[in-house]
Amino acid sequence: MKIGIIGAMEPEVAHLIASLENPVVSQIAGIEFTQGELNGKQVIVTRSGIGKVAAALATTLLIDKFAPDYVINTGSAGGFVDSLTIGDVVIGSEVRYHDVDVTAFGYEIGQMAQQPAAFVCDAHLVEAAKNAVAKLGEVKTVAGLICTGDSFICDPVRTAKMQADFPTMAACEMEGAAIGQVCHQFATPFVVIRSLSDNANNDSPVDFESYLVKAGHHSALMVMALIEGL
């Protein structure tokens, strides 16, 4: 079994890379790929860079060059669930874009033309992620909708609009749906696991800087426990 892991920033992948046995680092198009073994499985940890285009490029290269059986997206997110706090985890049941609007042509809000409205995370991986969280027992978690866009959300007006458009949204971030779209087109099973670094409000920039490392560590622990259970 070969598993690809994608995180946007160094703090989101550092713990995973440090845990690899026999790591081998390569770069393609400025994107860093670290191959190694984790819990007896072949793993490729990918630091994609921030945003949808960077994530799509990294995912395409990961699948094309390394052919993983599964793709796991890990990292931080802004939370939209009242019962969760910074450091808690959202497991994506599906991912959508919050900044796409081609409704003039009959598509749903957030649906890219000629694409499904949502990119559904693999049920086996979602269940494995839930089991991993239960095994660790360190943080609260929910499984639900994660929305993606090329903006850091800290404006109450924008937050309210997103909640109106996607009332079941559990978290927002900047890569997951792009990764989901590429995996969909390659027919590669995927899941998105995000630890909350902020609550998508006026305090988000301060919270994000303060809690990014904590969120990245929590998310990495979930990923490692998930891989152990596969």
UniProtKB/Swiss-Prot annotation:
InterPro entries named in the record: MTA_SAH_Nsdase, Nucleoside_phosphorylase_d, Nucleoside_phosphorylase_sf
Disulphides: none
Binding locations of substrate: 78, 153, 174-175
Keyword terms of this UniProt record: Amino-acid biosynthesis, Hydrolase, Methionine biosynthesis
Enzyme class, spelled out: hydrolase
Cellular component annotations (GO), alphabetically ordered: cytosol
Reactions catalysed according to its record: S-adenosyl-L-homocysteine + H2O = S-(5-deoxy-D-ribos-5-yl)-L-homocysteine + adenine; S-methyl-5'-thioadenosine + H2O = 5-(methylsulfanyl)-D-ribose + adenine; 5'-deoxyadenosine + H2O = 5-deoxy-D-ribose + adenine
Pathway as given in its UniProt record: Amino-acid biosynthesis; L-methionine biosynthesis via salvage pathway; S-methyl-5-thio-alpha-D-ribose 1-phosphate from S-methyl-5'-thioadenosine (hydrolase route): step 1/2
Its EC number(s): 3.2.2.9
A GO biological-process term: nucleoside catabolic process
Role: Catalyzes the irreversible cleavage of the glycosidic bond in both 5'-methylthioadenosine (MTA) and S-adenosylhomocysteine (SAH/AdoHcy) to adenine and the corresponding thioribose, 5'-methylthioribose and S-ribosylhomocysteine, respectively. Also cleaves 5'-deoxyadenosine, a toxic by-product of radical S-adenosylmethionine (SAM) enzymes, into 5-deoxyribose and adenine.
Family: Belongs to the PNP/UDP phosphorylase family. MtnN subfamily.
PANTHER family in alphabetical order: 5'-METHYLTHIOADENOSINE/S-ADENOSYLHOMOCYSTEINE NUCLEOSIDASE, 5'-METHYLTHIOADENOSINE_S-ADENOSYLHOMOCYSTEINE NUCLEOSIDASE
Name the record gives this protein: 5'-methylthioadenosine/S-adenosylhomocysteine nucleosidase
Annotated organism of origin: Shewanella amazonensis (strain ATCC BAA-1098 / SB2B)
Gene of this entry: mtnN
